[in-house]
Regions:
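Proteins that catalyze or organize thiol-disulfide redox chemistry
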Residues: 1-52, 59-106
Length: 106
């Protein structure tokens, strides 16, 4: 299941999560973000139960993007125990994306 993270649920769904969380910081107008959409959805299904995977629209949730210094998108931040532990930016293959997630959550 792909989550939608907002200022209203970020604390509960991401920072207080008992499992790792991958947040895809994106914008609707961003073409590389659109390219990564299906990859993120696939990873949400593949990592179900092991990690939460979801999106955070930077235009609608600027305070979150600013807090984590998101300046380029798509940006992917993996949180463990409420802290960012890995950040990577830009479009990539599903294989590379999966490897980065696996390395960060294991």
């Amino acid at each position: 299941m792909e989550y939608k993270f907002t200022v209203d649920n970020f604390e509960a769904e991401v920072l207080q999560s008992e499992i790792p969380v991958l947040v895809d910081f994106y914008a609707d107008w961003c073409n590389p973000c659109k390219m990564m959409g299906p990859v993120v959805a696939k990873m949400a299904a593949e990592f179900e139960g092991r990690a939460k995977v979801g999106k955070c629209n930077v235009d609608d949730n600027m305070t979150i993007a600013q807090k984590y210094r998101i300046s380029s998108i798509p940006a992917f931040v993996i949180f463990k125990n409420g802290e960012p532990v890995e950040t990577f930016v830009g479009a990539m293959s599903a294989t590379d994306f999966k490897k980065k997630i696996e390395q960060a959550i294991n």
